[in-house]
Every structure is written in C-alpha cells, then in structure tokens.
Regions:
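C-terminal motif of bacterial Sec signal peptides marking the signal peptidase cleavage site
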Residues: 14-17
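Catalytic domains of carbohydrate-active enzymes, especially glycoside hydrolases
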Residues: 40-65, 125-130
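Conserved beta-strand positions in the central sheet of alpha/beta enzyme cores
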Residues: 54-56, 138, 188, 316
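Substrate-binding surface in catalytic domains of secreted glycosidases
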Residues: 156-252
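Substrate-binding cleft of secreted/luminal carbohydrate-active enzymes
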Residues: 232, 240-337
Length: 337
C-alpha cells in the first residue's frame, strides 16, 4: 500500500513539474520584412531551433505621397509583398500592414475608404500567395495624440473583418492618457528603435537604460502584449549638417583597419579622409556610429518588461535576415530570455 502511495506521489510530482515547464515554455515568432519572402537554410535553422510556428509577414506599407487633389487623396500602398516561398505555407501567417503617421494627418481623410482599400489588398495578397483569406492581421503605426482619433476609427472599421493585433511603442505605454489606448484586444510592444539616432552616446536600437525611462515595476496596460525584440545591427552615418543615413549592417573590421577612419571609442568613428563606403560618399569629419546588440542588453531589456505589471505573451523577433541572424547567438538569447 505504501509503495503504491509513494509511486502515486512521485507520478503526481513529475506530472506537475512537466505542467509547470509547459506553462513557462517560450513561444517564439519572427517578422519577415522584405518584398520577397524567400527562405534558406539559415532561416530554416532559426525557425526550427526556436520551434517557431508563426511568421508575421510584412504585406505592404501605406504612405501619404502627396497632398490630396482632384484626382486622388495621395495615399498609396508601397513595398508590396511580391513573392513568397511555398515553404511559408507550413506556418501560421499574420499579415503586417505598416501605416505612416502622416496618413492620418491628411485633411478630409476618408477613413472608411482607406479601410476598404486595406481590406481588399490584404485579401488579394493572401489569396495570391496562400490561396485563402487570413483572419488575423497586425497594423503597425506610430500614432500620436493628434492622430489617434482617425487611427482608432480605422482600427474599429478593420475589426469588423479581421482579428487585429496592433503595435505599441514605449512612449504610448508611458503616456497612454495622452496617446490613448487602441480599440483592440491585443498588441505587440516594440522594444527596439527606442533611442535617438543622432545621439552618438546612445545605441538607438536598444538600451535597457532607455527602456527603464518608460517601463517601471508598476507599469500597466489594458491589454496583453507580445514582446518584439531586435536581432539586427546597423551603421549610422552623420554628416556635417547633422543629417543621418543608415546602413543595415555593421562591418567593424573595415572601420578599425581602414586609414580613412579614426576610432573614437568602441562604437564611434570619424572620417579623416574622403572615401566611398557601400555606395555612400563620406567626407572628412563625418561621424560613424556602429550600433550592435549584445545578448545581455536584449535580455536585460526583456527582463525590465517582465518585471513590470504588463501582461505579456509570445516573443517576436525582428527579423528573418541574413545579417541579423549572423550577428547574434540566437540559441543563447532564447535560452536566457
């Protein structure tokens, strides 16, 4: 009798332990943000190692190209998804539509007309590449206090047809009384591009000290949030007029070994002699900032979010890209998150 009782208790403990592990298991997804959704061995390895089942696939941008006139409202889709590898049909796809804030500053904006155009194009792309309609989409927009009413009206219209997820920036969490809370049931907190590109003492991609300026232990938000984290690095070039250009990669050995550049500190360089770099003409005195991410910085920033009162769900990495996946130890990162 005692043997059976002990065996039963052991089985119960093992089952409980497994249940706890399952409950805390990380759910990881990826963004794909290119007009041609290709797949290669590197992508496949990243998806397999993280047990990813969902891809947030960029479908198109909506931009305001010119002032409204007699012929049109100046609002058009750009960077429309052109090709999709059949391998993506094995994943749950969440279409992503990026809308610039300027769209909602257009005078006499016809929100319902814009909503219908977005619905139609999403369905067209889904049918073309996946032979079906997709019910869940993500809307990505860095709205402001002055544009919230038009943006929220659009979300309400889109909600009639789609299960919506919307992106939320750090400032929209901290200042939610001003920027408002979108009329949706779930969101994705964008924990990247948090700083100032022009501030060469910052890593504008991600810096935990900046995240802490917006998120505290008492921070709340009235909807569950996925957490979007960066994998990418970038080179920031600042000219004499303080204007910025970005190169979506970092080639540290070139700056450290080429005599056209002088190293100021770990991340900063100065052009000391005119030169060409990746198609950009760099003049003497231009500033160079290398923005690279360490696993520890991503983990620390993520922990700042987790230690708040925000309700969090899956982890979403930006993004499936050769340089991004080459510059970060993905296995180590996922293990530490």
């Amino acid at each position: 009798m005692k043997i059976h009782l002990v065996s039963g208790l052991l089985l119960l403990l093992i089952t409980a332990s497994c249940s706890q592990k399952d409950a805390t298991k990380k759910v990881v997804s990826f963004y794909h943000w290119k007009s041609k959704a290709t797949i290669n061995q590197q992508y496949q390895q990243a998806l397999k190692s993280t047990n990813t089942h969902k891809i947030y696939l960029h479908y198109f941008d909506i931009v305001s190209e010119h002032e409204a006139n007699w012929y049109d409202d100046g609002i058009f889709p750009t960077y429309v998804l052109k090709e999709v590898d059949p391998a993506y049909q094995n994943f749950e796809i969440v279409p992503v539509v990026y809308i610039t804030n300027q769209v909602f500053q257009v005078s006499n904006l016809e929100v319902q007309k814009l909503s219908n155009r977005i619905k139609d194009l999403v369905h067209q792309i889904s049918q073309k590449h996946f032979k079906k309609d997709i019910s869940q989409i993500q809307i990505d927009c860095d709205w402001t206090e002055s544009t919230k009413y038009a943006y929220f009206e659009l979300l309400e219209s889109l909600s009639d047809e789609f299960d919506l997820d919307v992106t939320i920036r750090l400032h929209q969490i901290k200042f939610k009384e001003k920027t408002g809370v979108p009329p949706v049931k779930k969101g994705t907190l964008m924990v990247y591009n948090v700083g100032d590109l022009k501030d060469f003492d910052q890593n504008s991609i991600l810096q935990n000290s900046i995240v802490k300026q917006y998120i505290t232990a008492d921070t709340k938000y009235p909807m569950p949030l996925n957490i979007a984290l960066p994998l990418f690095s970038q080179t920031v070039i600042k000219n004499k007029d303080n204007k910025i250009k970005i190169i979506n990669s970092v080639d540290r050995p070139t700056f450290e070994n080429d005599k056209h550049f002088k190293q100021i500190n770990t991340s900063q360089f100065e052009v000391v002699k005119d030169t060409l770099y990746k198609g950009f003409y760099l003049s003497e005195a231009y500033g160079i900032k290398l923005e690279e991410l360490a696993v520890t910085e991503i983990v620390d920033s993520y922990n700042t979010i987790k230690q708040s009162k925000l309700i969090t769900n899956e982890i979403l990495f930006y993004h499936l890209d050769k340089n991004s996946l080459s510059n970060i130890n993905l296995s180590e990162l996922v293990e530490k998150l």
